[in-house]
Amino acid sequence: MNQSFVSIATTIYPPSLQLKTLATLTSKSGGKTIVVGDQKTPSSWHETNISFFSLQAQLAEDPFTDFAKMLPINHYCRKNLGYLYGMRENPEWIYETDDDNLVSTEILNPPSLSSKETDHYIDNQGWLNIYDYTNILNGPELVGTVWPRGYPLELINDKFQKSDSREKFDYIEIQAPIANGLVDGDPDVDAIFRLTRSLPLQFEKLKRDLIICGGTWAPFNSQNTWWHKSVFPLLYLPVTTSFRVTDILRSYVAQSIIMKFDMGIRFFGPSAIQERNEHSLIGDFEQEIPLYLNSQKMMSEINSSIQTSDNIAQAQFMAYERLEKLGFVESNELSLLNCWIESIAKC
């Protein structure tokens, strides 16, 4: 069955208000909601308008059982199976979020794949702090002092000098097959920010969507993100990194490949509110250390590794091959990636 879009989340908790709201809005918009459980998820889990896959169902769900058995138990990357179940519905888009993110719009609609005359285009910027492009309604003095998880720490105090040569206001015809939205409340900042700053934050709606193009990099997460079917393979969450690294490292790989093939990434204003599940901030800090130390090196190495690639799948393998050689992922990551690609072919 063809769906306009499928919404994907994973959880270890009973059905939350956030997931119930997601399912309602997705259904009203003609989509389907899929939730992936784990060993800690209550065995009685059930919710109207949600297709739920327990751990037992995952291990028995042909044709993805091989991949399901390779994924570690009690691990966020079991969300990869949700993507595969979603792809099987043959949607145009996959929307992904988490069980502690409440969609704050009245309707949930996929973004535009093609650029629009109202978009704001940025290229050749280098690293971009997306939070610098919006005001903070409940703390205007914080503008310029907030940074997303995965943004290089050594660049936090650098002020981007806006210039006409770097910001394109004229219409550019480009496709943006990935779109990431801001999140109010407890947004995706790193543990250093959480340990030293105050939350919550409320962002002003962006006057226009931003599309970042070649030569510009901005980390994005798995909390409020749309993926077009043309780039579904790039949904792969690397398994052998920490929970706090996996989606950010994926974003480095995905945007490098997107821009290698002359596409862009759309960023849009706040459309969800996060009431964060319980975390150990010191534990988060420890998990995020690879990003604190190596974000620029990771991005540089990924970019250089894919220059001779001819297609997305080849570029993705080359990127993770380089990351494995440098020790940023473990030696079995390539086997997992190969099984992922084989599983996509079965959708």
Task: Label each residue range with its predicted role.
Residues P219, T225, S242-M263:
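A short, conserved alpha-helix in the catalytic core of glycosyltransferases
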Residues V231-T241, K260-F285:
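Active-site donor/metal-binding and catalytic loop motifs
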